[in-house]
Amino acid sequence: MTNTRKTHPLXKIINHSFIDLPAPSNISAWWNFGSLLGLCLIIQILTGLFLAMHYTSDTMTAFSSVTHICRDVNYGWLIRYMHANGASMFFICLFLHVGRGLYYGSYTYFETWNIGIILLFTVMATAFMGYVLPWGQMSFWGATVITNLLSAIPYIGTTLVEWIWGGFSVDKATLTRFFAFHFILPFIITALVMIHLLFLHETGSNNPSGLISDSDKIPFHPYYTIKDILGILLLILTLMMLVLFSPDLLGDPDNYMPANPLSTPPHIKPEWYFLFAYAILRSIPNKLGGVLALIFSILILMLFPLLHLSKQRSMMFRPMSQCVFWILVADLLTLTWIGGQPVEHPFVIIGQLASILYFAIILLILPTVSMIENKLLKW
């Protein structure tokens, strides 16, 4: 008798995706982040659902409702901080997942890569709107500053901003629609994740060597299920350490003050995971130029498959490209640091140089180094 797992229409899909999936035998811990991102998404949807049961999206009561969740709801403080720090864990996993893709040349799977970039944009939009919901000082001013960037669009900019706001400033209408979008987007993200996996399973996983691994495949279960469980345990451990010992480590103290349109915080800055893009935005004196640089800092990821000039897929055997890659990582860390600093000397010039270096590495240095390596290997 054939196994139900292999014949039942629904169980068959799960079987081909998570149990009998042929996987390369040599994928390292860098391949764990896909499953960790799935876990993060589940945690965020569940904690978010329970928060939404007690939250009110009204300017008068939003801040108080978050306070009520933390003080009066059973384990409300735990749910709230798991959701806030879960977002940070989500972005840590996202950045490492994208970094892995860049290092090992996984971007040569066009469809999977491009869906991944759309996912990155969607998650960033969701996180931004979620940050507005507690209606603290940084929520309000962050929303004002970031939505205002759209006014840089010629001709329709101002109208567009007022349309998004639902009025002449960030107010009740803005908060209500942001809550609605923040609620629906994770489900859209879930659908996109399924498409992401669908395209991935068309080609099979890449592996550290970048070579075709069809001749040496092993079943996903039990080998990679047990490996994923280790990653999951470490992720939960890290998240709970953050939540239970220093829940406000990555937050902004200004957000514990209710939103006040009449008083601007001394330094308006987004959450840490947007600081690199914020630094690039601020490094250009022109408003429209800054907005374009901000968008292209993420969109540039779509060019990687076109800029891949090396004859080898992975960077595993390309020491020169490895050096350039780690300089890019250091540059992104520098941009993250600069994004959190005030706009004054020497931070301005450091930010500008780091921004130039970021685009130069991706568009110029990495492709050039790849060609040099080809020549050195007489390819």
Curated annotation (Swiss-Prot):
UniProt xrefs under PROSITE patterns: CYTB_CTER, CYTB_NTER
List of residues binding heme b b566: 97, 196
Oligomer status and interactors: The cytochrome bc1 complex contains 11 subunits: 3 respiratory subunits (MT-CYB, CYC1 and UQCRFS1), 2 core proteins (UQCRC1 and UQCRC2) and 6 low-molecular weight proteins (UQCRH/QCR6, UQCRB/QCR7, UQCRQ/QCR8, UQCR10/QCR9, UQCR11/QCR10 and a cleavage product of UQCRFS1). This cytochrome bc1 complex then forms a dimer.
Pfam families listed in its UniProt record: Cytochrom_B_C, Cytochrome_B
List of residues binding heme b b562: 83, 182
Family label: Belongs to the cytochrome b family.
Gene Ontology terms: biological process: mitochondrial electron transport, ubiquinol to cytochrome c
Originating species: Spermophilus citellus (European ground squirrel)
Keywords from the named record: Electron transport, Heme, Iron, Membrane, Metal-binding, Mitochondrion, Mitochondrion inner membrane, Respiratory chain, Transmembrane, Transmembrane helix, Transport, Ubiquinone
Obligatory cofactor(s): heme b
Sites where the protein binds a ubiquinone: 201
Compartments where found: Mitochondrion inner membrane
Keyword Mitochondrion applies: yes
Misc. comment: Heme 1 (or BL or b562) is low-potential and absorbs at about 562 nm, and heme 2 (or BH or b566) is high-potential and absorbs at about 566 nm.
Keyword flag Signal: no
Cellular component GO terms, alphabetical: mitochondrial inner membrane; respiratory chain complex III
Residue stretches spanning the membrane: 33-53, 77-98, 113-133, 178-198, 226-246, 288-308, 320-340, 347-367
Record function comment: Component of the ubiquinol-cytochrome c reductase complex (complex III or cytochrome b-c1 complex) that is part of the mitochondrial respiratory chain. The b-c1 complex mediates electron transfer from ubiquinol to cytochrome c. Contributes to the generation of a proton gradient across the mitochondrial membrane that is then used for ATP synthesis.
Membrane topology: Multi-pass membrane protein
Name of the protein this chain belongs to: Cytochrome b
GO MF annotations in UniProt: metal ion binding; ubiquinol-cytochrome-c reductase activity
InterPro entries from the UniProt entry: Cyt_b/b6_C, Cyt_b/b6_C_sf, Cyt_b/b6_N, Cytb/b6-like_sf, Cytochrome_b, Cytochrome_b_C_euk/bac, Cytochrome_b_N_euk/bac, Di-haem_cyt_TM
Gene3D superfamilies assigned to the protein according to its UniProt record, in alphabetical order: Cytochrome Bc1 Complex, Chain C
Cofactor note as given: Binds 2 heme b groups non-covalently.
Superkingdom of origin organism: Eukaryota
